[in-house]
């Protein structure tokens, strides 16, 4: 897509607006970090409780480190595998709205996706996006194509971004909030690449 296309899409993701974007692990519903109205809309689409945790999509480790505290070991680990299909659980900074972090642990899941289209959109927006996988209420499998998303919930979205590179699967989740890194879920990201 041309650069101007991303600028137009970035402008569309205004207050209260939700988009579906392809990531390196499937499609996610996303909105701006500080947009409670849009976040509530995502909860409504997916029928999620207030306890559901969301992931922050960042365009770089630099942006990620403004939102979370990470020690040198964790930073080196994240740097070695990002961008890529990994979600890192870290202690949130004050930059993260409290409604997004874990209520007792004050942690948040962050990732730097590797697909170019989402990366370009993140750069144009200039801030992280909050997201969750596009799984419809009562279903176990995520929606896996743009046309399927358009058919089911297209009227509730500002736009659908599909760069055709999406692979459906889970991210590998690594908790870096404690003393030692801990793999919470093994997904598309190689655990051996983490050096664990």
Task: Identify the residue ranges that each predicted region occupies.
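Active-site-adjacent structural elements in enzyme catalytic cores
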Residues: 1-196
């Amino acid at each position: 897509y041309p650069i101007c296309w991303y600028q137009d899409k970035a402008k569309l993701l205004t207050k209260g607006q939700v988009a579906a974007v392809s990531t390196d692990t499937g499609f996610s519903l996303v909105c701006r970090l500080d947009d409670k109205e849009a976040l509530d809309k995502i909860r409504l689409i997916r029928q999620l409780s207030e306890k559901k945790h969301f992931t922050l999509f960042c365009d770089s480790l630099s942006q990620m480190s403004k939102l979370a505290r990470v020690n040198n070991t964790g930073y080196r680990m994240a740097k070695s595998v990002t961008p890529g299909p990994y979600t890192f659980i870290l202690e949130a900074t004050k930059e993260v709205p409290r409604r997004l972090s874990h209520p007792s642990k004050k942690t948040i899941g962050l990732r730097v996706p590797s697909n170019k289209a989402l990366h370009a959109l993140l750069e144009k927006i200039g801030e992280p996006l909050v997201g969750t996988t596009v799984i419809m209420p009562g279903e176990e499998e995520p929606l896996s194509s743009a046309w399927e998303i358009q058919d089911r919930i297209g009227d509730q979205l500002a736009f659908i971004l599909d760069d055709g590179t999406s692979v459906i699967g889970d991210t590998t989740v690594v908790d870096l909030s404690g003393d030692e890194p801990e793999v919470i879920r093994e997904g598309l990201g190689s655990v051996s690449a983490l050096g664990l």
